[in-house]
């Protein structure tokens, strides 16, 4: 009963990709499956909160059943844009034995390339903001729309965005509390091999 009450209190705004993935690991391989940062954040967070808000974009090729699954897990999809005649974001990657390092094989931005995120009025009072792995310029646009700063802002990113949109990423990072990246990404972002030195350098970029 106590857990149920706590679960209802926590409001989370989730911004990220709702996408198609093709993933290969040493333990198995998938072709085109439903994936995306926001999809997994939403489903995972549903075990802890009944008050989840989603801001993302998909093409008309994205299965309605997958959207229904999110809604069944108490994810409000009012902020999910569906672009007719366009294709959903697609990412393909190969993970190494340690499951911590990976190679990006293919990235098709598709609808994400011109995505203009709109934070609905009803989403403005969320206590927590989770900026999932997507274009840093989109993450920044969401930050700019927040009238009241959430209690905690978390930003996830990856090497692809560092390679192609580093300036946008550093701008978004100035406004966040927590940055989630792996060892390889921390070294690339900071230019330091030592993870202790990397963390200290990244903290100066914004994350606490």
What are these regions (language model features)?
Residues 147-150, 161-208:
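Conserved phosphate/ATP/ADP-binding segment of small-molecule kinases
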Residues 20-32, 49-130, 144-150:
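Conserved N-terminal subdomain of the carbohydrate kinase-like
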Residues 9-13:
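Extreme N-terminal starter segment of soluble prokaryotic enzymes
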Residues 59-61, 133-138, 158-163:
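Short beta->alpha connector loops
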Residues 28-43:
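Short catalytic helix/loop segments, enriched in acidic residues and glycine
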Residues 40-52, 201-202:
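A short, N-terminal amphipathic alpha-helix
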Residues 128, 152-154, 178:
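Structural preference for beta-strand elements that scaffold enzyme active sites
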């Amino acid at each position: 009963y106590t857990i149920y009450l706590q679960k209802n209190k926590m409001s989370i705004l989730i911004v990220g990709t709702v996408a198609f993935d093709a993933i290969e690991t040493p333990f198995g391989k998938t072709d085109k499956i439903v994936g995306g940062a926001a999809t997994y954040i939403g489903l995972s967070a549903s075990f802890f909160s009944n008050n989840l808000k989603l801001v993302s974009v998909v093409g008309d090729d994205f299965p309605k059943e997958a959207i229904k699954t999110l809604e069944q897990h108490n994810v409000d999809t009012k902020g999910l844009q569906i672009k007719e005649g366009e294709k959903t974001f697609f990412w393909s990657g190969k993970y190494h034995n340690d499951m911590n390092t990976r190679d990006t094989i293919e990235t098709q931005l598709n609808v994400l390339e011109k995505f203009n995120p709109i934070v609905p009025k009803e989403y403005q009072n969320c206590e927590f903001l989770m900026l999932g792995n997507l274009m840093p310029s989109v993450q920044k646009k969401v930050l700019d729309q927040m009238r009241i700063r959430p209690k905690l802002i978390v930003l996830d990113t990856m090497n692809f965005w560092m390679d192609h949109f580093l300036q946008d990423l550093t701008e978004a990072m100035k406004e966040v509390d927590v940055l989630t990246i792996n060892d390889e990404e921390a070294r690339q972002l900071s230019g330091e091999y030592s993870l202790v030195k990397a963390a200290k350098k990244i903290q100066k970029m914004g994350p606490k």
